[in-house]
Regions:
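Primarily recognizes the serine-hydrolase "nucleophile elbow" in alpha/beta-hydrolase
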Residues: 85-163, 197-200, 208, 219
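Short beta-strand/loop motif that positions the catalytic acidic residue
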Residues: 220, 226-228, 232
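The serine-hydrolase catalytic nucleophile loop
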Residues: 34-47, 61, 238
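Conserved alpha/beta-hydrolase "acid-adjacent" motif
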Residues: 233-239
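Catalytic nucleophile-loop/oxyanion-hole region of alpha/beta-hydrolase
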Residues: 7, 38-41, 64-102
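Conserved alpha/beta-hydrolase
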Residues: 48-68
Length: 249
């Protein structure tokens, strides 16, 4: 296995894993989840895929890990554009078959792959794992109508302050993704991986609320596999099923 790291356009840092031998190979681009960096979780998947004969590409979104950009700034459309940038780079590499580039995404990245396939074009296939379809439904499904109204009103007021003054509140990742599973994951990894120990805008919650990958899923034409987990408490299986139904429509 040949492993190499590159800094490409837009300041995106990526790592390729390639099987030995000189022939062109199909490629899988692995797209991480919420505030994820390429050193965590993805290498295990990438190594298995590479052992099966694929070139694999892991990367850091702008603002995270080793990539350039404002630290902690998470905007879904910008991350989708990052994936498209990686797709275009992959298709230019002499060791990659440009007609066989696929996307594999987990959690938030599992939603991004639909947008990247639509915006980038030429994607051979998609695997979306443990993603959500509709951010507003996913975040507010447990709230009463009054609680939801108050929650959204608070975010809108904070957004108005930001636009008027340029000031915004930055918080730890676990203040935004605050379920027990996520807290445990970030607490376990931030010591070993200092790039995980960052602050993000509190209004990232609003970015997630407004994000609806299902709208892109309805436009996807390439073969797609949607993977859900029965006991997923972050992105319940109903969210993945909604993505599936949208793709099949």
């Amino acid at each position: 296995m040949i492993i190499s790291t590159h800094k490409i356009s837009e300041g995106i840092t990526l790592t390729t894993r390639s099987p030995s031998g000189g022939k062109k190979r199909p490629a899988i681009i692995l797209c991480h989840g919420f505030c994820g960096i390429r050193e965590i979780l993805l290498p295990q998947f990438a190594e298995v895929f590479t052992q099966a004969g694929f070139v694999t590409i892991t990367f850091d979104y702008r603002g995270f890990g080793d990539s350039d950009g404002e630290r902690g700034r998470l905007i879904p459309e910008m991350q989708i554009d990052d994936i498209v940038t990686v797709i275009n780079w992959a298709k230019e590499q002499p060791f990659i078959d440009k007609e066989r580039v696929g996307l594999w995404g987990t959690s938030l990245g599992g939603g991004h792959v639909f947008g990247a396939a639509v915006k980038g074009g030429g994607v051979k296939c998609i695997v979306s794992q443990l993603a959500f379809a509709d951010g507003e439904k996913n975040i507010t499904h447990h709230m009463s109508s009054e609680e939801k109204k108050e929650f959204i009103s608070t975010l809108e007021k904070l957004d108005a302050v930001k636009k008027a003054s340029g000031r915004e509140k930055f918080v730890s990742i676990t203040r935004v993704l605050n379920d027990n599973e996520s807290k445990k994951f970030f607490e376990e990894n931030r010591t070993q991986y200092p790039d995980m120990d960052i602050k993000i805008p509190f209004l990232t919650v609003k970015e997630m609320l407004d994000y609806k990958p299902v709208q892109y899923a309805a436009q996807v034409t390439c073969p797609s596999l949607i993977v859900v987990a029965e006991k997923d408490t972050v992105n319940p299986k109903e969210q993945g099923i909604e993505l599936y139904n949208s793709v099949m429509h």
